[in-house]
Amino acid sequence: MTRDEKAKIVAELTDGFKNSEAVLVSDFKGLSVKALENLRNNAREVDVKVQVVKNTLANIALKNASKDGMELKDTNIFLWGNQIDVCKVAAKFEEQNESFKIKTAYMDGEVASLSKIVALSKLPSRDELIAMLLQVWNAPIQNFTIGLNALKEKKSA
């Protein structure tokens, strides 16, 4: 890989890391190509970016994006995007694949613990939260109309 290619990769990663809420690092040693494709497809559905990068290039990009502090060793795959989506994709994939291990993440201006990553992965998505809210708002109106219909039937009988 030439120096220009490396600089281009670092620039792209820096831009991606800067514009994301979370950067998650996982070990993927032992995963098949098919499993990695599955991870990428799952991530693409929720607009999470996935890339395998050399640790030295990733360290430079993380430092440029002001998200340094993560210790990068061995084989790493990087996921970045929305906090909850990144955590959900990684946690779900970790459950399905023994070879995939979440190592660390950078979110909210600091290196996150594994317990925080797992907790975020269990939160409902934005769409699910909106659906819950609409259901709560709709319940009183629905109960009111049911009551009116019952009253109407009682009076007509």
Curated annotation (Swiss-Prot):
Gene3D superfamilies, A to Z: 3.30.70.1730, 6.10.250.290
Pfam families found in the cross-reference section: Ribosomal_L10 (PF00466)
GO biological process: translation
Gene Ontology MF: a single term: large ribosomal subunit rRNA binding
Keywords associated with the record: Ribonucleoprotein, Ribosomal protein, RNA-binding, rRNA-binding
Highest taxon of the lineage: Bacteria
A GO CC term attached to the entry: large ribosomal subunit
Cross-referenced InterPro entries: Ribosomal_uL10, Ribosomal_uL10-like_sf, Ribosomal_uL10_bac, Ribosomal_uL10_bac_type, Ribosomal_uL10_CS_bac
Subunit structure: Part of the ribosomal stalk of the 50S ribosomal subunit. The N-terminus interacts with L11 and the large rRNA to form the base of the stalk. The C-terminus forms an elongated spine to which L12 dimers bind in a sequential fashion forming a multimeric L10(L12)X complex.
Function: Forms part of the ribosomal stalk, playing a central role in the interaction of the ribosome with GTP-bound translation factors.
Family: Belongs to the universal ribosomal protein uL10 family.
Name used for this protein in its record: Large ribosomal subunit protein uL10
Taxonomic lineage of the native organism: Bacteria, Pseudomonadati, Campylobacterota, Epsilonproteobacteria, Campylobacterales
